[in-house]
Amino acid sequence: MKYKHIVFDIDGTLIDTEYAVLHSLQETIKGLSGREIPCSELRFALGITGTDALKKLEIKDTSYAIELWDKNMRNYTNNIKVFDGIVELLKNLLSLDYEMGIVTSKTREEFTHDFCPFGISHYFKTIICADDTQEHKPNAAPILKYVELSKTDHRKVLYIGDSKYDSKCAENAGID
């Protein structure tokens, strides 16, 4: 077995959050600046930290904007679900003795609030959130932190994500 560790991104990979993220961001921008930006123009925000997305949108007070975005996100929680087949996949990987982990752009608080309620976090031994590293995707730092904490060889790690930021992060870390 070439890989011992299978590491996942969360949003767009394990859980379907696209609608919730984009619409709550759209609502946040409108509330802060009055600008109405189509969701299609906000897709760049998928896969990077909320703070980085807000900076790209030239929002000055990102701390307040994150609070507002989190509040707005709660209006869309009914639109978030685990992708079909994920629970079965995780069970199968566990039965095959893979060690599973997470590398996400979510903060630890967002991870706890947005992901843990789905009841699948127990499948993952090592979890790296945005506040665990100073640099974020597409920088290699989050995956390298996973390699460090899991005490493994980077060649035994496979990273699965859905965005260009995920693939670039893995590439920058020398991970498949």
Regions from the language model: what does each represent?
Residues 1, 95-98, 150-156:
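Glycine-rich phosphate-binding loop signature in dinucleotide/nucleotide-binding domains
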Residues 14, 82, 100, 135, ...:
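Conserved SAM-binding loop
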